[in-house]
Amino acid sequence: MSKHDTDTSDQHAAKRRWLNAHEEGYHKAMGNRQVQMIAIGGAIGTGLFLGAGARLQMAGPALALVYLICGLFSFFILRALGELVLHRPSSGSFVSYAREFLGEKAAYVAGWMYFINWAMTGIVDITAVALYMHYWGAFGGVPQWVFALAALTIVGTMNMIGVKWFAEMEFWFALIKVLAIVTFLVVGTVFLGSGQPLDGNTTGFHLITDNGGFFPHGLLPALVLIQGVVFAFASIEMVGTAAGECKDPQTMVPKAINSVIWRIGLFYVGSVVLLVMLLPWSAYQAGQSPFVTFFSKLGVPYIGSIMNIVVLTAALSSLNSGLYCTGRILRSMAMGGSAPSFMAKMSRQHVPYAGILATLVVYVVGVFLNYLVPSRVFEIVLNFASLGIIASWAFIIVCQMRLRKAIKEGKAADVSFKLPGAPFTSWLTLLFLLSVLVLMAFDYPNGTYTIAALPIIGILLVIGWFGVRKRVAEIHSTAPVVEEDEEKQEIVFKPETAS
């Protein structure tokens, strides 16, 4: 190795040490049991428990195929994130990786788009809580916004506790969700095998063929549905954020990621196939969990209510996770200058409380939306959440590609956990994410208006950058500099000036 190569390698190592310094203050308290369940629970939320009812109405049995396609690409994204985590675990997750491989402007865009995702997702979750509460007739007269505010208060308080307690609560939240799905799969399979009629219909595959087949509304509605189904997997990347507070991320994260793909297949695809073989797909309704519909049709007292409690837990779990992620992402951005400096503050419990409080303020807007337009909140904010998650996943893939390039050039150590089939699968995933945006444009009116809002989001991001660039320049002036590679005539890495 030449002296120039050695110097460049040392400079990259110094840069990573500077980035790792941003992790100071966190308490590495998460164990394998908690990380495993967080990864599983992150893939099971309101997108399955609440969203599946409306999706079955729109696409029928084809929803199973849509879940399978989205689940496969979600796995690719997780494997790409796994590469980055093994390279350098960080609570800032892909925002920190964007800072390392793409510069602070990219970290700024990645961070704020991810914040948009979780801000919108949180509004969806508190809306879901309110809808679930209205399942019980006794609460029918209570305004939707009251339940939304109550959920926000409970989960906001929970997130101010130390990470060990957050992880433990999230473990039990996730366990309840998993047990609920497993219970449905077992009961549904036994009932299907018994041949007993349900709600006046004999169960079986004929419920698909006799009700319009696999694509009852044609192929296009199923394709357009992809942009909504993406939201169902919008928490899977949380394992990357949690890696910064794991006891042993090098071992725990790969195990957690590899467990996700078959569970997506079982929980999502298996559940939908079973649902449409137990009842006609038209029996499921928007606004009510299809699992609640099934158990209610069984006629067993209180089963529907029990399942409704489970889906309430799922919504609270997702809201809890969102506050966890945004607090840490906003702190990472503040450390790089892309967010206000006060968001870098930590409590004595090692919690980035300032970022969490900032997110709670946004969630209050969601409560107000529940007061103004309670019937449309879920669909309105769902598309904006999808925009944020698509951007975030794209940054993960691009950073993974840049990491591979750095490894090939000897500027980073190789990792043992890799995305299979890369770079082909990397490019294929980016193409899939682009196609989701195109499909969203056909989802009139909400999806069309959301895509039309992209230029406005872009303008706001540009304005915001001009507001933070001076602080970014000040912070990055103290960062180690990687000099220009004169032989290759390209910039290997150089901290970005705020131009």
From Swiss-Prot:
Disulfide bonds: none annotated. Keywords: Amino-acid transport, Cell inner membrane, Cell membrane, Membrane, Transmembrane, Transmembrane helix, Transport. GO terms for cellular component: plasma membrane. It comes from the Bacteria. InterPro entries: AA-permease/SLC12A_dom (IPR004841), Amino_acid_permease_CS (IPR004840). It is a multi-pass membrane protein. It is found in: Cell inner membrane. Pfam families: AA_permease (PF00324). The chain crosses the membrane at residues 34-54, 58-78, 109-129, 146-166, 171-191, 219-239, 264-284, 298-318, 353-373, 378-398, 422-442, 448-468. PROSITE patterns: AMINO_ACID_PERMEASE_1 (PS00218). The keyword Transmembrane applies. One of its GO terms (biological process) is transmembrane transport. The keyword Hydrolase does not apply. Belongs to the amino acid-polyamine-organocation (APC) superfamily. Amino acid transporter (AAT) (TC 2.A.3.1) family. This is L-asparagine permease. The lineage of its organism: Bacteria, Pseudomonadati, Pseudomonadota, Gammaproteobacteria, Enterobacterales. The gene is ansP.
